[in-house]
Amino acid sequence: MQNLSLIPFLQDAVLVNEVRGMLAYTGTYNGKPVTVMGSGMGMPSIGIYSYELFKEYDVDRIIRIGSAGSYSSDAKIYDVVLATSAVSESTYAKVQSGYDKDESYPSKALNDSLRATAKRLGINMIEGAIHSSDVFYRQPSDEKPTYWEKLRDERGCLAVEMEALHCLQMLLY
């Protein structure tokens, strides 16, 4: 099931894609053309769609909206998290493009724009690193501190999700 909750915000929305069952609608928002599209879950899925959007359709920017599991007691359900980096143990980026670092960073200009827009709209955002993992639910462990506690404490990760590292490393090529 895709989250199509943004469609009502578009004027004159038209279905423009059904390939692989992934729906995309294009319309206008404040007079500017905007496309809203599902991406599936995980780096391989967003990898397919983001690659095609950037390389074949020449999109200007992708803003990923999705869910994350909190590593911080400060983050509550429905809070908005602005990623200042994505940390990952995944080998997806290395296999896909040769990117062999465990952390990627967003566009400063795009984050500045998101921050300014949120401020103008009165939306509170929590900012910090996030953990971009191939595994959303890990098996319980007797290890202390746990893997996620290390990421939270040593790398400052606020939450776990499964797509951001790929989205951010796409900015490099």
Task: Give the predicted meaning of each segment.
Residues 1-47:
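N-terminal short beta-loop-beta anion/metal-coordinating cradle
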Residues 104-156:
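Active-site rim beta-loop-alpha module in soluble metabolic enzymes
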Residues 14-19, 36-38, 61-65, 82, ...:
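General beta-strand structural signal in soluble alpha/beta enzymes
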